[in-house]
Amino acid sequence: MKKQGYKVAVDAVDSVGGVVIPVLLERMGVEVVKLYCEPTGNFSHNPEPVPENLTEICKVVKESGADLGVIVDPDVDRLALVCETGELFGEEYTLVSVADYVLSNTPGNTVSNLSSSRALRDVTEKHGMQHNASAVGEVNVTTLMKATNAVIGGEGNGGVIYPELHYGRDALVGVALFLTHLAKKGCKVSELKKEYPSYFISKNKIELTPDINVDEVLVKMKEKYASEKVTDIDGVKIDFPTEWVHLRKSNTEPIIRIYSESKDEESANALAHKIVGEIKEICRL
């Protein structure tokens, strides 16, 4: 790893990741550029590693000439990555890329939750293995991983679970595996990203009135799409040939969350818009 001469910029949002991530990288022979790595407990920005909170690290990566940007959340279980161009790698693709590396060395199955990208399934099948989807939640993912002897799994929000070490989301594991993958491929991060299927996930919600029975709405949507592949272990997920939509009710308010994935943003949003319209029709809104 040291001979690669990697430079990695780290945004640890001034939490514990600011201690452990730089140490890991330095021991791997990587030069570290630190951004918000003082564990003061006072988060320097919104700690959720989503695009709107990552503009600064993207700028630092580009201006410092770093090969990679690493962002972790306060408890270091979610990992987001930035390409050398300053563009986001995509939180869904953290797990996809790490799984690609693990499967190239260790044949086995993979698991992610129902709301995670289809890209993991594609990469798993490329290696001749089987992908399975669990209900949302780390405990559900790990339970299914154990049941199917999965060698890698996680959630599309940047959570990597590598059973060879332990059954829990771990950004440290993600960083080590991703950098090893990158070094063995001998390419830039932006080039690696282009190797994976391109999908876009749109996240929406529809607010209903308290008198509406959300469970009944989900049953009707399931019946409406009975000719498609429908999964109902966690809300209702409808798999179409080239896209999918996942409907989940909130446990605290009359809301249905709508996750849709397609080949690009426009198509994913169009699918979500169509589903919202159908739900409104069912509810007579």
What are the residue ranges of the model-derived segments?
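Phosphate-binding chemistry for phosphorylated carbohydrates and sugar-nucleotides
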Residues: 1-185, 192
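Phosphate-binding and adjacent anionic-ligand microenvironments
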Residues: 68, 106-285
